[in-house]
């Protein structure tokens, strides 16, 4: 087997896609990740980088193009790192995402369950209800792939028009008043990120994240943002003086209007503060949550624990079919929103606790809480081993795992198997059209013999929860 050489051109066929959205080819038995390639294509590939176990390249000539290839519809494609799949038909994109989930569950999770048909989006454009634009060197846009270099973006095909308009207003404000942007390397500069959340009715909440307590000419910035975003609910300053690239602030100050935004999801109303987690694709989130409720198998009397509950969306959707639901979340503002949302929606069979998921889960388990269902929707890094151990100690009949990263999902599925929990069903849901990212819902349960063990029934009234 001859070693691949940098700057040489080889001929190979694309076999599939990597987790990063790159085409996969094999040349002389070696894996090559190929930018902009489509499954099934025969290509001439220029090798640009050679590592010990793999190489990276790009297509120089298409010898046999795929019928699933399309001309990218975004002028920033290839520069902006936001959308990986704008050169694919949507049918091929959905195939790639479902296959990514299947590979993760099989190779990493050791599961032989076949992933159900992927739940695709009805509209793959302008779907993001939350936009976060990094700011750097006077530019407001998105990072170049695998870098923190910002590409200035005037119009994005997956953001709401209100977000692009706010970005233009911030860009002009920086230029007109010589306001410096933040430099990650030096820790100096002021403007770090622009955050825009838009609800179903088109009303928006704007937050400017800054490396300081005040902005120059704040009233001018507010005026420009209000003119750019006609139905603006409020403008908030988020103070983030930490080094690095953390987005959200340590504290917030309202510059004008409201500091929260209301939205409707699954027939319920949710108040959302800036730090509260809320799925960015509202329509597909409803599809995702319906699948999660289906997997939970609720009949009206179950006790459900929802870890990483955010503003209480899944918690309150589950509450409609359960006896009682407990939500846990580490962000105080999100818990405040969750409690207020339950009050507004008239939902009385929910209770929320603020704290670290691992600590709360361990405390729940130690106090003898025995839920019928545990639902988890962790961040991209997945579940800590301590969370899985505590969840298993609570001995639920079913675990519903909502994941935004197939890799960490596969890892966690394997860890759950150590406690006897196996994947029973799995479904992929496309909340992020145009990108490589995909959501997954997995149902885990123990074997039939294990699930028939005698369960200890405890109500919350029987437990001392005063320390939470």
How should these model regions be labeled?
Residues 117-124, 184-185, 191-193, 428-431:
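Short, solvent-exposed loop/turn elements at beta->coil junctions and helix N-caps
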Residues 23-28, 141-145, 209, 338:
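Short, acidic/hydrophobic/Gly-rich beta-strand patch recurrent on exposed beta strands
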Residues 2-8, 19, 213-468:
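Rossmann-like S-adenosyl-L-methionine
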Residues 40, 159, 281:
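Short, conserved phosphate/pyrophosphate- and ester-handling motifs at nucleotide-, phospho-/glycolipid
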Residues 196, 202-211, 269-273:
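Short, aliphatic-rich beta-strand segments
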Residues 25, 40, 83, 194, ...:
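Residue-level signal for inorganic ion chemistry
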Residues 1-76, 351-352, 359:
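Terminal RNA-binding accessory module
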Residues 60-72, 78-181, 201, 215:
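Extended interfacial segments that mediate partner engagement and assembly in macromolecular machines
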């Amino acid at each position: 087997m001859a070693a691949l050489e940098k700057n040489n051109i080889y001929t190979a066929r694309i076999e599939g896609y990597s987790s990063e959205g790159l085409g996969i080819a094999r040349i002389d038995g070696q894996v090559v990740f190929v930018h902009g390639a489509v499954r099934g294509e025969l290509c001439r590939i220029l090798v640009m980088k050679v590592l010990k176990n793999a190489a990276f390249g790009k297509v120089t000539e298409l010898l046999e193009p795929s019928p699933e290839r399309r001309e990218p519809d975004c002028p920033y494609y290839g520069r902006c790192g936001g959308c990986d799949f704008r050169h694919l038909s949507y049918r091929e994109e959905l195939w790639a995402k479902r296959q990514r989930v299947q590979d993760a569950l099989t190779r990493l999770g050791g599961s032989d369950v076949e992933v159900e048909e992927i739940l695709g989006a009805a509209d793959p454009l302008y779907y993001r209800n939350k936009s976060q634009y990094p700011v750097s060197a006077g530019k407001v846009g998105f990072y170049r792939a695998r870098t923190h270099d910002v590409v200035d973006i005037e119009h994005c095909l997956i953001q709401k028009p209100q977000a692009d308009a706010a970005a233009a207003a911030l860009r002009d404000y920086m230029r007109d008043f010589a306001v410096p942007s933040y430099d990650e390397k030096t820790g100096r500069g002021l403007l770090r990120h622009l955050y825009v959340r838009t609800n179903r009715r088109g009303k928006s909440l704007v937050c400017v994240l800054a490396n300081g307590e005040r902005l120059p000419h704040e009233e001018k910035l507010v005026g420009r943002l209000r003119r750019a975003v006609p139905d603006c609910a409020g403008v908030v300053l988020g103070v983030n003086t930490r080094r690095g690239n953390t987005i959200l602030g340590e504290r917030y100050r309202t510059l004008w209007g409201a500091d929260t935004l209301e939205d409707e999801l699954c027939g319920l109303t949710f108040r959302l503060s800036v730090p509260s987690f809320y799925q960015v694709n509202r329509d597909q989130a409803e599809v995702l949550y319906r699948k999660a409720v289906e997997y939970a198998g609720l009949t009206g009397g179950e006790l459900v624990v929802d870890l990483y509950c955010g503003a209480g969306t899944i918690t309150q959707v589950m509450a409609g079919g359960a006896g009682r639901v407990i939500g846990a979340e580490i962000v105080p503002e999100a818990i405040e929103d969750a409690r207020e949302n339950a009050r507004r929606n008239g939902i009385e069979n929910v209770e929320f606790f603020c704290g670290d998921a691992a600590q709360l889960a361990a405390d729940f388990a130690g106090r003898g809480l025995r839920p019928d269902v545990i639902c988890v929707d962790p961040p991209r890094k997945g579940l800590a081993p301590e969370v899985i151990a505590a969840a298993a100690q609570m001995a639920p009949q079913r675990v519903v795992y909502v994941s935004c990263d197939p890799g960490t999902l596969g890892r966690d599925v394997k860890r759950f198997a150590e406690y006897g929990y196996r994947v029973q069903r799995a479904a992929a849901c496309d909340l992020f059209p145009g990108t490589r990212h995909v959501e997954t819902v997995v149902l885990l349960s123990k074997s039939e013999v294990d699930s028939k063990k005698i369960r200890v029934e405890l109500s919350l009234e029987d437990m001392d929860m005063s320390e939470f």
